[in-house]
C-alpha cells in the first residue's frame, strides 16, 4: 500500500479552507442577474462560456490534494443542491463558504466544534420554519414565467416558454429540452401518451402525406410475447372486424405469417390494423404495457394473469379516441381508461421514484408518470452557434427545474431577501451555551452573503444595499438587474422556496463537517528516481569487426 500524508488540526483545516475559497470564488462570480461569465477550457473545440454555478464547480480540480478535498466537499454542496432542487447551486456555494470561513475563526479561537455544529443546526431548522411562513403558492402563469426568467439569468423568453409548456401539459406533464434548428426557441406539444416505437411495416401507412398510420376510435390489443402464428390472433380479429373498428396490436414482436396476414387485410381494406413493438426492455417493458393498459382501459394479455390470445374478448382490449403511428413514435390520444385507476397508477410510480437508487431509473419512472399524467412538451432551444446553444440549453434546464420546485413548495421574494427576512425573525434565538450561540451567529452572518454577492457582481456597494434592505420589511429588496429598490414580488424577482431551503440545508451540512474535521489523510507523492539515458543500439552490420589493434 502507498504511504500516506497525514495532516492534523489547524494545518489540515487551513489547506481545506484554501481549497473551499478557490472553488467558491470561481463559482460566486456567476451569482445574480449581473453575474459574470466563466470560460471553461475544452480538450478540443471551442471553450464553453457559462453562468451556471454547478458547471463551473464540476470543472475544478486542484493540484494540492488537501486543498482539493476542501474544493470537492463544496462541489458536493453544489451538485446535491442541483440534484434536489435543480437550481440554487451558486447560493449554496456562497453560504457554505461563509459558514466555513466564519466557523474556522471560532474554532481557531478555541471554541468547541461540536457545539458550533449544534448551534448551526439549530439556526438552520429555525430558518426553514421562517421560510415556510414567508412562502406563498406559485400557481399563476405569470409567476411561473417570472421564476423561470430569474433562474435563466433574467431571460424572459425562457421563462415565458416554460410557462407556456406547463400550461399545455399540466404541472405533472413531461417537458423535455432539445437542440433546435432555428435561432428562436420553439415549443412542440404532443397530446396524450407517446412512446418510441413505430409501425412494423410501412404497408400500415394510411396517410401518405404525413407518412403515418392514423386509427380513429380503435381497439388496442396488448400482448407480452411474440406473435408469429395468425391462428392465435384469428378469434380477436373476427370480433374486431364484426365491431367495424380499427385495431392496434402492441406486442413484444409481430412477424412471419401473422404480420403478412395483417398487412394483406389492411391493404385490401378488410380490417384496418397496425402492429408495433412494445416499448422498453425486460421488466420495464412489462411495466409500460401495464401503463398503456390502464390508460386505454384494457388488459395485458399474459399467461401470468391467466389470459391467452385465443380466449381474448373485446372486453380485454383497450380503447382510445385516436392513435397516430409514425416510423419511430406512437401517440395514444384520449385513452378510455378510468381516471381513478390512472391516478392510482401514478401514485404507485411516485412511490417507486422515491425509492429509486439510480438516476437512470428515476428518470425513466418520471417519464412514465408524465406519460400517464398527460402530454409531452418539447422545448427546442434556438441559438446562432454551438457554444451559445450549450450554454442556453443548460439555462433552460435550470429554469425548468426551478419552476417545478416553485410549483411544488411555493415561492419567496428573490434576490437574497427571503434569507434576510428569515434572519430578522431569529434575532432572539439562543443556544444551550456560549459556543452554540456562536454557531447561530455564524449562520445569521452567512444569510446576508448571497445578497452581498449579487450586489457586488452588479458593481454596487454591498454594505449600503444590505443595510437599506434590512431597514425595509416584507418583500422590500434590491433588484440588481435594474438597480432599483422595491417590492421584489411585484418586480417579478422570485425564488422557489425549495431552492432556498435546499441551498441552506446542504451548505450548513457540509460546512459543519468541515468545522468538525481534525485530520486529513492523502496519498504521498512517490519520489521516482530520474530515468537514465536509454541504451544505444550498436551500428547494424558491424557485429563481426575485430577492434583489436
UniProtKB/Swiss-Prot annotation:
Instruction: Give the chief site where it resides.
Output: cytoplasm
Key words, A-Z: ATP-binding, Chaperone, Cytoplasm, Isomerase, Nucleotide-binding
Where ATP binds, per the record, is at: 30-33, 51, 87-91, 415, 479-481, 495
Name the reaction it catalyses: ATP + H2O + a folded polypeptide = ADP + phosphate + an unfolded polypeptide
Q: Which PROSITE patterns match?
A: CHAPERONINS_CPN60
Q: Name one GO cellular component term.
A: cytoplasm
The entry's localization annotation reads: Cytoplasm
The record ties this protein, via Gene3D superfamilies, to: GroEL, GroEL-like equatorial domain, TCP-1-like chaperonin intermediate domain
Keyword Chloroplast part of the UniProt annotation: no
Write down the top EC class of this protein: isomerase
- Binding partners and assembly: Forms a cylinder of 14 subunits composed of two heptameric rings stacked back-to-back. Interacts with the co-chaperonin GroES.
This chain's protein is named Chaperonin GroEL 1
Amino acid at each position: 500500500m502507498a504511504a500516506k500524508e497525514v495532516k492534523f488540526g489547524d494545518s489540515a483545516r487551513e489547506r481545506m479552507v484554501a481549497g473551499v475559497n478557490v472553488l467558491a470564488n470561481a463559482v460566486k462570480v456567476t451569482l445574480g442577474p449581473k453575474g459574470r461569465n466563466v470560460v471553461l477550457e475544452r480538450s478540443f473545440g471551442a471553450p464553453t462560456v457559462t453562468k451556471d454555478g454547478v458547471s463551473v464547480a464540476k470543472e475544478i480540480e486542484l493540484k494540492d490534494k488537501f486543498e482539493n478535498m476542501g474544493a470537492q466537499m463544496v462541489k458536493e454542496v453544489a451538485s446535491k443542491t442541483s440534484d434536489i432542487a435543480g437550481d440554487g447551486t451558486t447560493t449554496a456555494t456562497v453560504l457554505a463558504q461563509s459558514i466555513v470561513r466564519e466557523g474556522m475563526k471560532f474554532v481557531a479561537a478555541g471554541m468547541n466544534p461540536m457545539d458550533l455544529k449544534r448551534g448551526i443546526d439549530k439556526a438552520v431548522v429555525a430558518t426553514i420554519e421562517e421560510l415556510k411562513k414567508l412562502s406563498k403558492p406559485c400557481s399563476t402563469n405569470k409567476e411561473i414565467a417570472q421564476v423561470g426568467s430569474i433562474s435563466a439569468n433574467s431571460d424572459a423568453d425562457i421563462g415565458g416558454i416554460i410557462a407556456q409548456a406547463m400550461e399545455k401539459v399540466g404541472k405533472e406533464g413531461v417537458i423535455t429540452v432539445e437542440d433546435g434548428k432555428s435561432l428562436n426557441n420553439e415549443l412542440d406539444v404532443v397530446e396524450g401518451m407517446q412512446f418510441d416505437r413505430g409501425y412494423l411495416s410501412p404497408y400500415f401507412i394510411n396517410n401518405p402525406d404525413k407518412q403515418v398510420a392514423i386509427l380513429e376510435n380503435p381497439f388496442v390489443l396488448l400482448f407480452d410475447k411474440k406473435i408469429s402464428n395468425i391462428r392465435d390472433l384469428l378469434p380477436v380479429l373476427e370480433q374486431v372486424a364484426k365491431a367495424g373498428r380499427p385495431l392496434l396490436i402492441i406486442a413484444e414482436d409481430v412477424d412471419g405469417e401473422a404480420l403478412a396476414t395483417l398487412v394483406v387485410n389492411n391493404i385490401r381494406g378488410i380490417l384496418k390494423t397496425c402492429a408495433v413493438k412494445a416499448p422498453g426492455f425486460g421488466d420495464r417493458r412489462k411495466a409500460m404495457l401495464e401503463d398503456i393498459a390502464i390508460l386505454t382501459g384494457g388488459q395485458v394479455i399474459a399467461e401470468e394473469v391467466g389470459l391467452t390470445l385465443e380466449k381474448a374478448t373485446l372486453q380485454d382490449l383497450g380503447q382510445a379516441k385516436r392513435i397516430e403511428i409514425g416510423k419511430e413514435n406512437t401517440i395514444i390520444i384520449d385513452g378510455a381508461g378510468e381516471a381513478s385507476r390512472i391516478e392510482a397508477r401514478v401514485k404507485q410510480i411516485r412511490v417507486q421514484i422515491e425509492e429509486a437508487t439510480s438516476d437512470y431509473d428515476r428518470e425513466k419512472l418520471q417519464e412514465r408518470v408524465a406519460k400517464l399524467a398527460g402530454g409531452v412538451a418539447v422545448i427546442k432551444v434556438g441559438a446562432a452557434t454551438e457554444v451559445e446553444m450549450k450554454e442556453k440549453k443548460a439555462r433552460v434546464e435550470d429554469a425548468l427545474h426551478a419552476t417545478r420546485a416553485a410549483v411544488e413548495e411555493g415561492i419567496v421574494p428573490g434576490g437574497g431577501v427571503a434569507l434576510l427576512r428569515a434572519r430578522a425573525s431569529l434575532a432572539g434565538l439562543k443556544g444551550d451555551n456560549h459556543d452554540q450561540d456562536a454557531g447561530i451567529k455564524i449562520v445569521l452572518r452567512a444569510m446576508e452573503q448571497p445578497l452581498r454577492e449579487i450586489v457586488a457582481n452588479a458593481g454596487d456597494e454591498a454594505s449600503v444595499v444590505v443595510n437599506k434592505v434590512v431597514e425595509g420589511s416584507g418583500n422590500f429588496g434590491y433588484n440588481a438587474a435594474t438597480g432599483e429598490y422595491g417590492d421584489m414580488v411585484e418586480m417579478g424577482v422570485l425564488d422557489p422556496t425549495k431552492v432556498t431551503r435546499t441551498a441552506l440545508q446542504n451548505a450548513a451540512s457540509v460546512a459543519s463537517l468541515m468545522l468538525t474535521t481534525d485530520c486529513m489523510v492523502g496519498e504521498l507523492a512517490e519520489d521516482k528516481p530520474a530515468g537514465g539515458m536509454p541504451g544505444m543500439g550498436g551500428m547494424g552490420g558491424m557485429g563481426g569487426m575485430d577492434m583489436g589493434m
